[in-house]
Amino acid sequence: AEFETLLYTHPIINFFGCSYVNVERVGKVWFYVDFEGLAQHYGIPTRVFDFSNDLSTAAFFAVTSYDSKTEYYTPYIPNENVKLEDKYGVLYYYDVMIPNLDTNSRPLGMSFFNRPGAQSGYAYTLNDNKDLNIEPQVKKLFFKHDGYVSKMIYNNMAKGKLLFPTDTLCRKAKEICRFDKCSKLAFDLWAK
């Protein structure tokens, strides 16, 4: 809720919000801001799982490890001493061909902020502590980790810099994650 109150201070979000806007020669167009999906993309824990409709982006996240202390990704390079299950990775994908009116998946890439667009982001909501591994439209592709390939994918994405462009929300989202309290405005929004 704190992130949502922050977003409402942005002039474009404040103007459009979640509303219909009359577009000449088109008619009414619904503008929707996925606050929870955006929060997840900026590192705020939510019930949303990030997907991408770009294979290079998905591959980057499948072959890298994230260090929360340094806030950097590094290529995952297995050595001969790792456990068998750590030698394999998984690439999750959302099967759009399964007929289902699933509203858990929605695009984030067309937003007013850089990061979701750079990652071709999709948000998938996991309601009620559901397990991603048993969701009918979520499929898995297993692969064997290879250090050379991990480094190649990592370097092709400029060590992640292409996926994490700096924008106005990055610093603010980090501040929100460090808070142990919330504003009254955020609490009131959450309580609705």
Language model feature labels by segment:
Residues 1-192:
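Catalytic-core elements of nucleic-acid end-processing and repair enzymes
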